[in-house]
């Protein structure tokens, strides 16, 4: 599949589904309610994967669930509809999903991780097994006066 084929595939899905495409300088964004995606031009396997992922936020499964589920659903949809899925695209998906887990762990325990055995972990490339959250890192609070004037 050539980059032009990839671009045409994304354009066809957008046309058929009534999704408006806006330019975006990096990564992508999507609005399911407004049926809009903002993406970089599709010129490679990675920009193709990202474009399909953003379309997955509009058309894919799990989009009304918490963020980690929605992200996994968008990648699942992208992988299923892609005309080709290369190792580079798989790596992009895996790195993105991994970054979402790190994001959730930093905000623990507010953010719900997908349960063990959920397809999220398979998409990430992690075998289903019990997982433990890392304990949240407590930030030491220092008063502004102490920062300005040091200890007294």
In which residue ranges do the predicted regions lie?
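Active-site scaffold of zinc-dependent metalloenzymes
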Residues: 1-5, 11-46, 58-61
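A metal-dependent hydrolase signature that marks the N-terminal structural subdomain at the beginning
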Residues: 1-23, 73-76, 132-135, 139, ...
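Anionic, Ser/Thr-rich low-complexity intrinsically disordered regions
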Residues: 29-30, 62, 87, 95
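Long, well-structured alpha-helical subdomains associated
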Residues: 42-43, 84-152
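Short alpha-helical catalytic segment bearing the HExxH-like zincin motif
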Residues: 46-54
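Alpha-helix N-cap/helix-initiation sites
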Residues: 49, 67-71, 86, 90
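Catalytic Zn2+-binding segment of zinc metalloproteases
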Residues: 55-73
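Alpha-helical segment that forms one wall of the substrate-binding/catalytic cleft
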Residues: 70-82
């Amino acid at each position: 599949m050539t980059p032009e084929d990839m671009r045409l595939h994304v354009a066809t899905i957008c046309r058929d589904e009534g999704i408006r495409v806006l330019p975006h300088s990096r990564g992508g964004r999507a609005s399911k309610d407004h049926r809009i995606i903002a993406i970089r031009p599709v010129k490679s396997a990675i920009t193709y994967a990202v474009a399909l992922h953003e379309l997955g936020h509009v058309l894919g499964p799990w989009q009304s669930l918490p963020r980690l589920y929605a992200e996994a659903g968008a990648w699942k949809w992208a992988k299923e509809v892609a005309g080709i899925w290369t190792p580079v695209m798989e790596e992009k998906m895996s790195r993105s999903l991994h970054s979402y887990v790190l994001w959730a762990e930093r905000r623990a325990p507010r953010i719900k991780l997908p349960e063990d055995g959920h397809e999220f972990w398979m998409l990430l490339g992690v075998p289903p097994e019990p997982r433990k959250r890392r304990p949240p890192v407590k930030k030491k609070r220092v008063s502004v006066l102490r920062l300005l004037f040091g200890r007294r």
